[in-house]
Amino acid sequence: MRIAVPNKGRLHEPALELLERAGLHVQDGSDRKLYADTVDPEVSVLFARAADIPEYVADGAAALGITGLDQERESETDLVDLLDLEFGSCRLVLASPEDGGVSAPEELSGGTVATEFPKITERYFEELGVRPDIVEVSGATELTPHVDIADAIVDITSTGTTLRMNRLEVVDEVLESSVRLFADPAVADDPKVEQVTTAFRSVLDADGKRYLMMNVPEDSLDAVEAEIPGMGGPTVMDVAGQDTVAVHVVVDEREVFEVIPKLKAAGATDILVTEIERLVP
């Protein structure tokens, strides 16, 4: 089974890191290679442009693809969106010059809009009943309003810095995007696909969590349990030969700083905090 992964750019390293954390170490995934094996003999990696990945999956060259929702929507491939991988977040926005006088998309009827996403842009304006001339460009979209190529643009933004640097302001949000795990509909229910999806989900579920272990006198257990903000009831185990129990619990990382003094005050000792690599419910 092949997984298509971005071959370069801002999505490349996070995608490889996710594979690594999920237990699918990529063997010799150098920049110039098109294919690479993983430690699982049934899973290999195909490196491709992020924009091409939806087509590779739709054509059966890969069973799974890691790419942005914006790329899949632009490709019109109708893949199965299995999982939001929670990185590469961005927005596709309609923007125009700050002094251009465009305050609503309806004002662009009969105007010109430049974009690297012509299909998404066309659908967006069709839903609004607006008919601008859409010009496809392959880069430097934000410059087009300043050289009289377009009245507005539809482009990707993460922080808005590039738009502000080019004296552009957001008129409307077209699409909110992030990197997803997509599947060919023909194999979406395959057991191996489910195994990979579960592995990825376990990594995401572990993010922001910490595993707490502590020793607690039996007569302090109720007081300690009252201070535990964990995902569920803690695991409590007897410690041989002592009037003490070992308490294990998963908590949100942001709660650790506040909860440790409360646990100590309630009677817990030998508190150990560790990271969690993967969490499978």
From Swiss-Prot:
An example Gene Ontology biological process = L-histidine biosynthetic process
Control of this protein's activity: Feedback inhibited by histidine.
Please give the cofactor(s) recorded in the UniProt entry for this protein. Answer: Mg(2+)
Q: List the disulfide bonds.
A: none
EC number, UniProt record: 2.4.2.17
PROSITE patterns in the record, alphabetically? ATP_P_PHORIBOSYLTR
Q: Can you state which reaction this protein catalyses?
A: 1-(5-phospho-beta-D-ribosyl)-ATP + diphosphate = 5-phospho-alpha-D-ribose 1-diphosphate + ATP
The family database entries (SUPFAM superfamilies) matched by this protein are listed as:
GlnB-like, Periplasmic binding protein-like II
Chief location bin: cytoplasm
InterPro entries recorded:
ATP-PRT_HisG_long, ATP_PRibTrfase_cat, ATP_PRibTrfase_CS, ATP_PRibTrfase_HisG, HisG_C, N-reg_PII-like_a/b, N-reg_PII/ATP_PRibTrfase_C
Which purpose does this protein serve, as stated in its record? Answer: Catalyzes the condensation of ATP and 5-phosphoribose 1-diphosphate to form N'-(5'-phosphoribosyl)-ATP (PR-ATP). Has a crucial role in the pathway because the rate of histidine biosynthesis seems to be controlled primarily by regulation of HisG enzymatic activity.
Which PANTHER family does UniProt cross-reference here? ATP PHOSPHORIBOSYLTRANSFERASE (PTHR21403:SF10), ATP PHOSPHORIBOSYLTRANSFERASE ATP-PRTASE (PTHR21403)
Q: Which family does it belong to?
A: Belongs to the ATP phosphoribosyltransferase family. Long subfamily.
**Mind telling me what this protein is named?**
ATP phosphoribosyltransferase
Q: Can you name the source organism?
A: Natronomonas pharaonis (strain ATCC 35678 / DSM 2160 / CIP 103997 / JCM 8858 / NBRC 14720 / NCIMB 2260 / Gabara) (Halobacterium pharaonis)
Primary gene name: hisG
